[in-house]
Amino acid sequence: MTLYEELKARGLVAQITDDEIIDLINNGKATFYIGFDCTADSLTAGHFMALTLMKRLQMAGNKPIALIGGGTTMIGDPSGRTDMRKMLTKEDIDHNAACFKRQMERFIDFGEGKAIMLNNADWLLKLNYVCLLYTSPSP
């Protein structure tokens, strides 16, 4: 069974955009990302499935990108809620992101040429996009 077939059989792949992705995954040539909003200072059991998938793909030679949502966490996400998520300060978000990184390093190899960790605050805050979204009315 190939890696892709295993992931599909376990229900970890719902769809793909191109069949070339199958070969990339099976041959350890895929670069992929999974996003994490840092609304708390600790990863949860819900994050564990994503980390397990990242680890499994990395062990097969693929390159994971852990995308920390430092910028998007500043906005909040009321999806499926009747109230807004508590707004966190930049300092709280930076602290949570640092905690996530320390915890993720137990599972994912962030060494040279391995996994990458990015924080979308690094580019979103420079665009002042966060300010626009923060001051825009909620639907």
What are the roles of these predicted feature ranges?
Residues M1-A30:
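Positively charged, low-complexity intrinsically disordered leader regions
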Residues L3, I93-N96, N128:
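General structural feature for long, well-ordered alpha-helical segments within catalytic domains
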Residues I21-P78:
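N-terminal catalytic cores of NTP/NDP-binding nucleotidyl/phosphoryl-transfer enzymes
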Residues G76-G80, L127-L132:
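Short acidic, glycine/serine/threonine-rich loops at helix termini
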Residues R81-M87:
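Short glycine-enriched, charge-decorated loop/helix-capping segments at active-site entrances
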Residues L88-F110:
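A glycine-rich helix N-cap at a beta->alpha junction
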Residues Y134-P139:
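Conserved small/polar residues in nucleotide/adenosyl-binding loops
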